[in-house]
């Protein structure tokens, strides 16, 4: 293996923004925020939108994730095209 070409792989805490669920894993991701973990050490904290605690596949619950109104925006821009009939 070559030296100095691999990214820094270190322990990181990920936190679910919706549920507050946290887990410690290893990652190349970095953050200025830190958190004291159960073992007494400080680790970088990365807040994410979805984890296994809140993802519909794992929870069995459906949740709308359309934060930007993308479907409505698409309908406004292109919705009329499907309704128009082509003239022969």
From Swiss-Prot:
<dbReference type="GO" id="GO:0006412">
    <property type="term" value="P:translation"/>
</dbReference>
<dbReference type="GO" id="GO:0005840">
    <property type="term" value="C:ribosome"/>
</dbReference>
<dbReference type="InterPro" id="IPR034704">
    <property type="entry name" value="Ribosomal_bL28/bL31-like_sf"/>
</dbReference>
<comment type="similarity">
    <text>Belongs to the bacterial ribosomal protein bL31 family. Type B subfamily.</text>
</comment>
<keyword id="KW-0687">Ribonucleoprotein</keyword>
<dbReference type="InterPro" id="IPR027493">
    <property type="entry name" value="Ribosomal_bL31_B"/>
</dbReference>
<dbReference type="Pfam" id="PF01197">
    <property type="entry name" value="Ribosomal_L31"/>
</dbReference>
<protein>
    <recommendedName>
        <fullName>Large ribosomal subunit protein bL31B</fullName>
    </recommendedName>
</protein>
<comment type="subunit">
    <text>Part of the 50S ribosomal subunit.</text>
</comment>
<dbReference type="GO" id="GO:1990904">
    <property type="term" value="C:ribonucleoprotein complex"/>
</dbReference>
<dbReference type="GO" id="GO:0003735">
    <property type="term" value="F:structural constituent of ribosome"/>
</dbReference>
<keyword id="KW-0689">Ribosomal protein</keyword>
<dbReference type="InterPro" id="IPR002150">
    <property type="entry name" value="Ribosomal_bL31"/>
</dbReference>
<dbReference type="InterPro" id="IPR042105">
    <property type="entry name" value="Ribosomal_bL31_sf"/>
</dbReference>
């Amino acid at each position: 293996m070559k030296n100095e070409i691999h990214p820094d792989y270190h322990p990181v805490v990920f936190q679910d923004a919706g549920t507050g669920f946290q887990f410690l894993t290893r990652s190349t991701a970095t953050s200025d925020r830190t958190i004291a973990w159960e073992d007494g050490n400080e680790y970088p904290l990365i807040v994410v939108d979805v984890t296994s605690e809140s993802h519909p596949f794992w929870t069995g619950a459906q949740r709308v994730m359309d934060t930007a109104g993308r479907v409505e925006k698409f309908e406004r821009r292109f919705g009329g095209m499907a309704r128009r009939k082509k003239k022969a």
